[in-house]
C-alpha cells in the first residue's frame, strides 16, 4: 500500500524516528501503525546494542523539587549536538517528572519505572536507536527535607539541589544558596560533615609542608589547625563567604533570615567533571 506524508508525520510524532525510518517501517507493517511502532522499536534496540561500547561523554542534567523532595537526573549521550536538542532535553524532563511523582531510591529503581508503557531503561534504549547515538541514564540523586530547592545552571551541564531544616524559606534565599553551591563547589555543609579521611589527608599535607619549611615543632599543631580552618572556610558551605556579599558567610546570611535556619544537605552534579 502507498504510504502518505500524513502517515509518516503521525508515526514520527508517536516515535520520534526519522522520516525514512518511519516510511520504511510503515511499508514493512503494511500501513499498520502499531506494527510500525514495533518495527522501529526493534530496529532501535539493534542499533543501540551496536553502540554499547561507545563512550557517552556528553549529556544533559536537570533538577527539580516538589513538596520536600528534590531530584537530579542526568542522561548521557555521545555528542553535544544531541545533548542540546529539544527532543533529548524533553526526554530528561520526562524522566525527572517520574522521579518527583514516584520518589525512587536508587538509579536501578528509576530504570524500572515506566514512561509510555515501557521501563525507562528500555525507553532510553529505543530513543538511542532512533537517534543513532548511545544514550544511558547516567546519574540520579535525590534528597528530602522540610524545604527543598533546585537550580540548573544555563547549558544543562550543572545542577544543584538543596534541603533546608525549615518548612518556610524565602524563594530568593533558597536560590542564592543553590547558586552559591553551583559557583563555589563546597564539599560539605559544615566541617563536621567532612569525611575523616579528607581531614586526615589535609592535616598530613599541612604538617609535612610546615616541616619542610623548617617550622619549629612547638608551633606545628597551631600551623596545622590554621591550615585546616582555611580549608574549612574554602570548602564547607556554611563557612564560605557569600558570593553576593563577601563580607558575610553563608551561615551569617541564613541566620539573618531566621535564627535557626540552616542547610541539612545538598547535591551538586557537574557533567563536565564526571
From Swiss-Prot:
GO CC terms, sorted: cytoplasm
Predominant localisation class: cytoplasm
Disulfide bonds: none
Keywords associated with the record: Cytoplasm, Elongation factor, Protein biosynthesis
Keyword Ribonucleoprotein appears in the UniProt entry: no
Cellular location(s): Cytoplasm
InterPro entries assigned to the protein according to its UniProt record, in alphabetical order: EF-Ts_dimer_sf, Transl_elong_EFTs/EF1B, Transl_elong_EFTs/EF1B_dimer, Transl_elong_Ts_CS, UBA-like_sf
SUPFAM superfamilies linked to this entry: Elongation factor Ts (EF-Ts), dimerisation domain (SSF54713), UBA-like (SSF46934)
PROSITE patterns in UniProt: EF_TS_2
GO-annotated molecular function: translation elongation factor activity
Residue ranges, annotated region (Involved in Mg(2+) ion dislocation from EF-Tu): 79-82
Similarity section: Belongs to the EF-Ts family.
NCBIfam families associated with the record: tsf
Function of the molecule: Associates with the EF-Tu.GDP complex and induces the exchange of GDP to GTP. It remains bound to the aminoacyl-tRNA.EF-Tu.GTP complex up to the GTP hydrolysis stage on the ribosome.
Alphabetical list of HAMAP family matching this protein: EF_Ts
Protein's name according to its UniProt entry: Elongation factor Ts
Organism encoding this protein: Azobacteroides pseudotrichonymphae genomovar. CFP2
Organism ancestry: Bacteria, Pseudomonadati, Bacteroidota, Bacteroidia, Bacteroidales
Gene name for this UniProt entry: tsf
Amino acid at each position: 500500500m502507498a504510504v502518505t506524508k500524513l502517515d509518516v508525520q503521525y508515526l514520527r510524532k508517536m516515535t520520534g524516528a526519522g522520516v525514512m525510518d518511519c516510511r520504511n517501517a510503515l511499508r514493512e507493517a503494511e500501513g499498520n501503525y502499531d506494527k510500525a511502532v514495533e518495527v522501529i522499536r526493534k530496529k532501535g534496540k539493534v542499533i543501540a546494542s551496536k553502540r554499547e561500547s561507545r563512550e557517552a561523554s556528553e549529556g544533559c542534567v536537570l533538577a527539580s523539587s516538589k513538596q520536600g523532595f528534590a531530584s537530579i537526573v542526568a542522561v548521557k549521550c555521545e555528542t553535544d549536538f544531541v545533548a542540546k536538542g529539544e527532543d533529548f532535553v524533553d526526554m530528561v524532563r520526562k524522566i525527572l517528572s517520574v522521579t518527583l511523582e514516584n520518589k525512587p531510591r536508587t538509579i536501578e529503581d528509576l530504570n524500572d519505572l515506566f514512561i509510555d508503557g515501557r521501563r525507562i531503561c528500555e525507553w532510553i534504549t529505543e530513543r538511542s536507536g532512533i537517534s543513532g547515538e548511545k544514550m544511558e541514564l547516567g546519574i540520579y540523586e535525590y534528597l528530602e527535607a522540610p524545604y527543598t530547592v533546585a537550580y540548573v545552571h544555563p547549558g544543562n551541564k550543572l545542577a544543584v539541589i538543596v534541603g533546608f531544616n525549615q518548612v518556610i524559606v524565602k524563594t530568593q534565599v533558597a536560590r542564592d544558596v543553590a547558586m552559591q553551591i553551583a559557583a563555589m563547589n563546597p564539599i560539605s555543609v559544615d566541617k563536621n560533615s567532612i569525611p575523616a579521611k579528607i581531614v586526615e589527608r589535609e592535616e598530613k599535607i599541612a604538617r609535612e609542608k610546615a616541616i619542610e619549611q623548617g617550622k619549629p615543632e612547638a608551633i606545628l599543631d597551631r600551623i596545622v589547625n590554621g591550615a585546616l580552618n582555611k580549608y574549612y572556610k574554602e570548602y564547607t558551605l556554611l563557612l564560605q563567604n557569600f558570593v553576593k556579599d563577601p563580607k558575610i558567610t553563608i551561615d551569617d546570611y541564613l541566620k539573618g533570615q531566621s535564627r535557626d535556619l540552616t542547610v541539612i544537605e545538598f547535591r551538586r552534579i557537574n557533567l563536565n567533571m564526571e
